[in-house]
Curated annotation (Swiss-Prot):
This is Urease subunit alpha. GO terms for molecular function: hydrolase activity, acting on carbon-nitrogen (but not peptide) bonds, in cyclic amides; nickel cation binding; urease activity. It comes from Natronomonas pharaonis (strain ATCC 35678 / DSM 2160 / CIP 103997 / JCM 8858 / NBRC 14720 / NCIMB 2260 / Gabara). The gene is ureC. Its EC number is 3.5.1.5. Binds 2 nickel ions per subunit. GO terms for biological process: urea catabolic process. Carboxylation allows a single lysine to coordinate two nickel ions.
Length: 570
C-alpha cells in the first residue's frame, strides 16, 4: 500500500522537492527545484529509527575499498552553475565529488546509483532542508594579512588567488624568493591557493623566473607601470607559459588611453580587474572593455551593489589604498577621477545582463574578504527589485536563471579563467569536494558548514563546554579539517605548469599537493557560464560619465536598503 504525503509534510520530513520554491535568505530571490533524484519512500535519512541503518539504507558488506562513500550529504538542494537547481544526495570519496544522485543500499532501496553506495565506512550528514553550493573562489586577493583565510572560509570561499605579502597594495608577489616563501607560508592554510607574480616588465626574463618559481599567473598593476610595452611582453610570455594575466590599467592615462591598452592586448585573453574603474583603470572609460570577447571582466565588491553610501566611501578608500596625500591637489584629483557614480550605477546592470562575468573582493585594498558572496546576492536582489524578472525567468514565478547567473560569478567562471576548473567551481563528479552548506534563511551571508576536500573545516558550532553543539554562543568556528596535518590533504596549491614539472612542491618542502593551472590562454567570454554577453556598442561619455549601449542609457538607482545586511549582524 502506498502512502501519499501532503507536500508540506513531505518537505518537513525530507526537504523540498520538484516544484517547491525556496527563498534565499531575506532576498526576494526564489529558487525552484528542477529535479529530485529521490526515490520517494526510499529516502536516505540518518537518525534514531531512520533508514540509514545496518541492513536497511546501509549495505553492510561494502567497504570503502570496494567503493563505499566516505560521506553522503543526504536530501540536499544543490544550487550549482553547471548542475542547476536540484535535490539529491551528494556522495564524496577520497576528497572528491562522486556525484549527485540517490545514495543508499541497492539491496533494499530502489533507484540507488551504482557509485553512491552507503557502507559501514560512510558517514551520513542529514542535509534535508539545507542548500549546497560549490565552495566559492576569490581570484583577486591582496594577501596583506594571513587572517584573511579565516574570514574567507567563514564566508564560504575555499579558493584564493592573488598576491602581496603585507604592506603593499598590489596583488602580486614579485620575485622567485618571495614566491617561494609565500608558498611555504600558505602550506598552513586549509584553502586552495595560487599566487600572481609581477607582470610589469618590458623584458621577459624577470617574468620567467617568477613563473618558474611557482607563480600561477601574472598581475599587471598601474602602480608598477601598466604600459603598452609591459602589457605586450607579459602577454607574449603568458602565451608560451599557459598562465593567466590579470590587469589593473592606467587610471591617469599617462602611458596611453584605453585604446592603446586594447591594442597592446591584441586579442589575447586577459582578466580585467575591477572593470568599472573605481578600483583603478583608465578614467573614465575602462568599462568599454567589457564589449570584447577576449576581455574577461570582473568586479570587486566595494562598489557592488550601488547604494547611497558607495560614492562617499570610495574616495577615502582610494586615498589610503594608493598612499595618496589629501594635501596634494594632484593626488585628490587622481582619487576623484576614479570614483564615478554613473559608471558604478551601470556596473550593477552589466552584471544583471551577464556582461560582467565574475565577482571578487580586492581584499584589504578597498574590498572586503568575507563579502564576495553576500554582495553578489545583494546585487541580484537589487536588480530583481529594480529591473524585474529576467526574460528567461518571466512567467516562472521563480528566479532560477538569475540565480545561476549570479552563483556562476564566484564559482565556475573564475575557475575557468584561472585554469583550475578541472578541480573546483562546481559540484561535478571528480572535482574537489569543496562544498558550502547553508540554511535557507541564512543563504549568502552565514554558512552552516564549509566542507573542504570532503572534510569539515568551518561550521556553526556552539559552546565547547555545552551539553550540545547547539548551546549558545553558536558561532563560526574551525573544525578538525583546519588543523594538524589534515589540512594538507584537503587542499591544492596551484602553480604554473613549468613550476609543477620542475617539482617546486618537493623542492620547497610543501605538504599540500601541488597542481598546474591549465588552458588559460584559450578562454573567451563565450566560456563564461550565464555571463557571456558582449555589448558591441558600449560608450562612456567623457564629460558626464554616462554609460550607454547602442545609444540606450544604462543605469540604476542607488539602493537605500539591502538584504543580507544588518538583520543578520549584531
Amino acid at each position: 500500500m502506498t502512502k501519499t504525503l501532503p507536500r508540506e509534510e513531505y518537505t518537513d520530513l525530507f526537504g523540498a522537492t520538484v516544484g517547491d520554491r525556496i527563498r534565499l535568505g531575506d532576498t526576494s530571490l526564489l529558487a525552484e527545484i528542477e529535479h529530485d533524484h529521490a526515490t520517494y519512500g526510499d529516502e536516505a535519512v540518518f537518525g534514531g529509527g531512520k533508514t540509514m541503518r545496518d541492513g536497511m539504507g546501509m549495505q553492510s558488506g561494502t567497504t570503502q575499498a570496494d567503493g563505499a562513500l566516505d560521506w553522503v550529504f543526504s536530501n540536499v538542494v544543490v544550487v550549482d552553475p553547471v548542475l542547476g537547481i536540484r535535490k539529491g544526495d551528494i556522495g564524496v570519496r577520497n576528497g572528491r565529488i562522486v556525484g549527485v544522485g540517490k545514495a543508499g543500499n541497492p539491496d533494499t532501496m530502489d533507484g540507488v546509483d551504482d557509485e553512491l553506495v552507503v557502507g559501514p565506512s560512510t558517514d551520513t550528514v542529514p542535509a534535508d532542508g539545507l542548500i549546497a553550493t560549490p565552495g566559492g573562489l576569490d581570484i583577486h586577493v591582496h594577501f596583506n594579512s594571513p587572517q584573511l583565510v579565516d574570514h574567507a572560509l567563514a564566508s564560504g570561499i575555499t579558493t584564493m588567488f592573488g598576491g602581496g605579502y603585507g604592506g603593499g597594495a598590489t596583488t602580486c608577489t614579485p620575485g622567485p624568493n618571495n614566491v617561494k616563501r609565500f608558498l611555504q607560508a600558505a602550506d598552513e592554510w586549509p584553502v586552495n591557493v595560487g599566487f600572481y607574480g609581477k607582470g610589469n616588465s618590458s623584458q621577459p626574463e624577470g617574468l620567467a623566473e617568477q613563473v618558474e618559481a611557482g607563480a600561477c599567473g601574472m598581475k599587471l598593476h598601474e602602480d608598477w607601470g601598466s604600459t603598452p610595452a609591459a602589457i605586450d611582453t607579459c602577454l607574449e610570455y603568458a602565451e608560451s607559459a599557459d598562465i593567466q594575466v590579470c590587469i589593473h590599467t592606467d587610471t591617469l592615462n599617462e602611458s596611453g588611453f584605453v585604446e592603446e591598452t586594447f591594442d597592446a592586448i591584441d586579442g589575447r585573453a586577459i582578466h580585467t580587474f575591477h572593470i568599472e574603474g573605481a578600483g583603478g583603470g583608465h578614467a573614465p572609460d575602462v568599462l568599454e572593455l567589457v564589449g570584447h570577447e577576449h576581455m574577461l571582466p570582473s568586479s570587486t565588491n566595494p562598489s557592488m551593489p550601488y547604494t547611497e553610501n558607495t560614492f562617499d566611501e570610495h574616495l577615502d578608500m582610494v586615498m589610503v589604498c594608493h598612499h595618496l596625500n589629501p594635501d596634494v591637489p594632484e593626488d585628490v584629483a587622481f582619487a576623484e577621477s576614479r570614483i564615478r557614480a554613473e559608471t558604478i550605477a551601470a556596473e550593477d546592470v552589466l552584471h544583471d545582463t551577464g556582461a560582467i562575468s565574475m565577482m571578487t573582493s580586492d581584499s584589504q585594498a578597498m574590498g572586503r574578504m568575507a563579502e564576495v558572496i553576500s554582495r553578489t546576492w545583494q546585487t541580484a536582489d537589487k536588480m530583481k527589485q529594480q529591473r524585474g524578472p529576467l526574460p528567461e525567468d518571466d512567467g516562472t514565478d521563480a528566479d532560477n536563471h538569475r540565480i545561476k547567473r549570479y552563483v556562476a560569478k564566484y564559482t565556475i567562471n573564475p575557475a575557468i579563467v584561472a585554469g583550475i576548473d578541472d578541480y573546483v567551481g562546481s559540484i561535478e563528479p571528480g572535482k574537489l569536494a569543496d562544498i558550502v552548506l547553508w540554511e535557507p534563511a541564512f543563504f549568502g551571508i552565514k554558512p552552516k558548514t564549509v566542507i573542504k576536500g570532503g572534510f569539515p573545516v568551518y561550521s556553526q558550532m556552539g559552546e565547547a563546554n555545552g551539553s550540545l553543539m547547539t548551546c549558545e554562543p553558536v558561532e563560526m568556528r574551525p573544525r578538525a579539517g583546519a588543523m594538524g596535518n589534515a589540512k594538507h590533504g584537503l587542499s591544492v596549491t596551484f602553480v604554473s605548469g613549468t613550476a609543477h614539472e620542475a617539482g617546486v612542491g618537493d623542492a620547497y618542502g610543501l605538504d599540500t599537493p601541488v597542481r598546474p593551472v591549465d588552458g588559460t590562454r584559450s578562454v573567451r567570454k563565450a566560456d563564461m557560464l550565464y555571463n557571456d554577453y558582449c555589448p558591441d556598442d558600449i560608450d562612456i561619455d567623457a564629460q558626464t560619465f554616462e554609460v550607454s549601449i547602442d545609444g540606450e542609457h544604462v543605469t540604476c538607482e542607488p539602493a537605500d536598503e539591502l538584504p543580507l545586511a544588518q538583520r543578520y549582524h549584531l
